Each structure stands twice: as structure tokens, then as C-alpha cells.
Amino acid sequence: MALFLASLSWSPSPLEKKYAQNPTDISRAQLPASFATAENIALIFHGRGGPDRETDDLKARFLAQDAAVGLDRAVEVYNWEEYLEGTDRVGYTGQALGRKFGKILAQNRALRSLHVVGTSAGSFISDATCSAYVAEAGDSRACVRLSLTDPITVRGGEELGDGWGLRNFGADCDFAEHYLNTDDIVPSTNIPLQRCHVYDVTGCAERASFPPP
């Protein structure tokens, strides 16, 4: 409901209207078959660079920690590189994919927990997956957690300091978190998200020894 109310005052940009007239074909996009019956799911969406060392490491961490506590969870990095278009379209395409995936996940009535992680341009697909799942699954839904790392918050045609994501990311989740650093050059990633718990890692000492991907 929070996301719905927030969106009432949002005026579609010219690029959003243009995208709606010629949306990206996502008809082939499907989730792993194991998600149809899994009781616990972790779904990771990469940024514009595609799957990399960081997404591989994140999946490995999920699996190792789950094994340590005996949690049976389906964990996957979803490769959506073929849908990564120009910066004026990628946010809208990400939301379209997320809406599709959320509805697919809602068909799994055994699902107990859903943890979605999005990096950079993967923010829109991640948030939309959570919101669509919550809307479709209703009262019997699973517990939903969203984790965003250095998320891009604007879609094509939006101002860098006033993007859709700043106002809405995480609105429909049981728990949403934003890992923020404020000193990089990527547009629209340096402002805390309004509806997420924010962890500002800008000054963390560990960054000095962290090799960029």
C-alpha cells in the first residue's frame, strides 16, 4: 500500500511514456525451475557489467552460511545481460522483468522467505520483484527482504537527485537495506534511500584493501 500511495503523485516522464509504447520483449525471461517449490529463495541481480566476482562471492556466502545453520535455500544469480539496454531504458526494463518475476514467485504457495539482492542497475528489477510478489501473493506471502548495494535510483528522464528509486525502493518489503558509499562517480548512487535501513560504508577501513571488480 505504501508504494501504491507514493506512486499516486508520480507523473510519468516523457521517456516512461515512450517506453510504454515500445517495451522490451521479456517473453523468454524465466526463473529457475527450482524456485517453483522452494521454501526459501535468495535471488541475486547483477549490475550493468553482468555476473562477476562479487555476485559469485555473494552466492557462495549464501550457500556457506545456509549450510552452517542447516537452512535449505535455493540461491541463484540471475543473468539478465540480454535485457540491459541504454541508460534511458534499463530502469523501465528492470521493473518490467521484476513485475513478471514477482508474479511467478507468487505461484509458489510453499515459499516462506524471499531475499532479493540488487547491485547498481539491478536495483529496479530487485525492488519490482519484491513489490510484485507481495501484491500477488496476498496475506499468505513469505517474509520478504531486499538488499541493495550501490543502487542506481533514476530511470530515463528523471533528475539525479529526485529519482523514482529514492522515494520507493523497499516500500513493500518486510525489511529493506541500502549499502551506501558516497564517494564514487556513478550517477544517482550517493543518496540514502528513504524507505531502507542505510549502512554508510564510505569510511570503512576495509575499503582500502578491497580490489575493484
Where in the sequence are the language-model features?
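Serine-dependent carboxylesterase/thioesterase catalytic core
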Residues: 10, 47-48, 52-53, 57, ...
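Short beta-strand-to-loop junctions in surface cap/lid or active-site-entrance loops
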Residues: 24-38
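Bacterial Sec-dependent N-terminal signal peptides
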Residues: 8-20
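Short glycine/proline-enriched loop/turn "hinge" motifs that connect secondary-structure elements
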Residues: 34-36, 67-70
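Generic structural motif
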Residues: 16, 22-28, 144
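Short beta-strand element of the alpha/beta-hydrolase
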Residues: 39-47
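Hydrophobic membrane-insertion alpha-helices, especially the h-region
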Residues: 1-8
